[in-house]
Design a protein with these regions (language model features):
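Transmembrane beta-strands of outer-membrane beta-barrel pores
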Residues: 52-58, 76, 87-93, 113-115, ...
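Membrane-embedded beta-strand positions of outer-membrane beta-barrel proteins
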Residues: 50-52, 83-85, 109, 122-124, ...
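Residues that define the transmembrane beta-barrel architecture of outer-membrane proteins
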Residues: 30-32, 64-66, 101-105, 136-140, ...
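Repeated loop/turn-to-beta-strand initiation elements of outer-membrane beta-barrel proteins
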Residues: 45-50, 79-83, 116-120, 152-157, ...
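Outer-membrane beta-barrel proteins
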Residues: 42-44, 74-78, 111-117, 144-152, ...
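Membrane-embedded beta-strands of outer-membrane beta-barrel proteins
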Residues: 36, 70, 107-109, 142-146, ...
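Outer-membrane beta-barrel "beta-signal"
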Residues: 109, 210-222
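Start-of-domain marker
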Residues: 25-75, 82
């Protein structure tokens, strides 16, 4: 791993955190989610990732969620599987409008390959939710992503679809589902972008509630 890449990686993380805090300090019918991240190859088998995400509700005007996520990925087992361990710090508003914290370590196994010429990945995630003023719990998430083998316009937009199911490992069980449709784009050799529409349904008190989300993302590679 080159020292110059290490320095760039740290600078990128600091920039992402600073940008997130600026948005956090600023003060509807849909939500807007904004994600920025960085990925660093430590060596041939190991990588390090960092991510910041902000979520706005009430037409994209009120910040209600923010997380920072740091993780390590092992890619040396086989070309078709990545293993990861992460720690996520979450700040979100509760029903009273108060900010509460959550510590969320999570473990990931991502299977990837080609099926009928399509790029397909399936990520299994097991996370422990250590929540402030609420019961702690384990949750399992499974996300299936399919990328189409086409590139649209001069920007080389690649369309994809995805579905993610959430299962609380208690009496509640399956309680959330997300459907994605979007485009990924290579902004440059080391920067990738993402824009998507997400439809989320969540079970609450025996009723299913839905929300529409427009999301954008940027990821830097080192």
């Amino acid at each position: 791993m080159k020292a110059r890449n290490q320095v760039r990686f740290v600078i990128t993380i600091v920039t992402i955190v600073f940008a997130g805090e600026v948005c956090f300090a600023s003060g509807g019918d849909f939500e807007y989610w904004s994600t920025a991240g960085a990925s660093l190859d430590i060596n041939r088998d190991w990588g390090c990732t960092f991510e910041e995400e902000l979520r706005f509700k009430d037409g994209g005007g009120e910040l209600y969620y923010h997380h920072s996520d740091l993780g390590f990925v092992y890619k040396g087992l086989a070309s078709w599987i990545d293993l990861g361990v992460n720690f996520r710090k979450v700040y979100s508003k509760n029903s009273a409008g108060e900010w509460v914290q959550e510590d969320r370590p999570h473990f990931n196994a991502t299977l990837k390959g080609k099926v009928f010429g399509l790029d397909v990945s399936n990520r299994s995630r097991l996370e422990y939710r250590d929540r402030e003023n609420e019961k702690d719990l384990w949750r399992y998430r499974n996300k299936l992503t399919v990328k189409l083998p086409v590139e649209l316009t001069r920007l080389k937009l690649q369309p994809y679809v995805a579905e993610e199911a959430f299962f609380n490992l208690d009496d509640e069980g399956f309680n959330r589902n997300r459907l994605y449709s979007g485009f990924s784009v290579n902004v440059s050799k080391k920067v990738k972008g993402d824009i998507y529409y997400l439809w989320q349904t969540t079970e609450s008190n025996g009723k299913w509630e839905d929300v529409s989300v427009i999301g954008t993302g940027l990821k830097f590679y080192f």
